[in-house]
Amino acid sequence: MLFSSLLCVFVAFSYSGSSVAQKVTQAQSSVSMPVRKAVTLNCLYETSWWSYYIFWYKQLPSKEMIFLIRQGSDEQNAKSGRYSVNFKKAAKSVALTISALQLEDSAKYFCALGE
């Protein structure tokens, strides 16, 4: 059945910190991809911080937040299992790629910026 072989990924973005100089945005609101394929979720940010981290989380239907991966501003591209990050500091862009998609990957994804 075609529907059961597709998953939906909803993208939402947030930031942490006390200053309005920190901002996280996205262009994708939802993505549908077949299982076993890969999907890339984009996150653009603005910050005045010299050193910072970008975190990716997945929110389950139960509203539970699951930490996926962290990217440091002075680190090489992060990778953890099926999750990998393409970090472009000069472009203020960080993209999360999820490989070998599974139906369990259907969720809302959050990109967060913190010190």
Swiss-Prot record:
Annotated ranges, domain Ig-like: 22-115
Organism, scientific name: Homo sapiens (Human)
Location relative to the cell: Cell membrane
A single BP term in Gene Ontology: adaptive immune response
InterPro entries named among the record's database cross-references: Ig-like_dom (IPR007110), Ig-like_dom_sf (IPR036179), Ig-like_fold (IPR013783), Ig_V-set (IPR013106), TCR_variable_region (IPR051287)
PANTHER family linked to this entry: IG-LIKE DOMAIN-CONTAINING PROTEIN, T-CELL RECEPTOR ALPHA CHAIN V REGION
Keywords on record: Adaptive immunity, Cell membrane, Disulfide bond, Immunity, Immunoglobulin domain, Innate immunity, Membrane, Receptor, Signal, T cell receptor
Principal localisation: membrane
Disulfide bonds: 43-111
UniProt entry tagged with the keyword Protease: no
Gene: TRDV1
Function description: V region of the variable domain of T cell receptor (TR) delta chain that participates in the antigen recognition. Gamma-delta TRs recognize a variety of self and foreign non-peptide antigens frequently expressed at the epithelial boundaries between the host and external environment, including endogenous lipids presented by MH-like protein CD1D and phosphoantigens presented by butyrophilin-like molecule BTN3A1. Upon antigen recognition induces rapid, innate-like immune responses involved in pathogen clearance and tissue repair.
Name of the protein in its database record: T cell receptor delta variable 1
Keyword set includes Membrane: yes
Organism lineage: Eukaryota, Metazoa, Chordata, Craniata, Vertebrata
Assembly and binders: Gamma-delta TR is a heterodimer composed of a gamma and delta chain; disulfide-linked. The gamma-delta TR is associated with the transmembrane signaling CD3 coreceptor proteins following the stoichiometry: a single gamma-delta TR heterodimer associates with one CD3D-CD3E heterodimer, one CD3G-CD3E heterodimer and one CD247 homodimer forming a stable octameric structure. Upon activation, gamma-delta TR complex associates with FCER1G to initiate intracellular signaling.
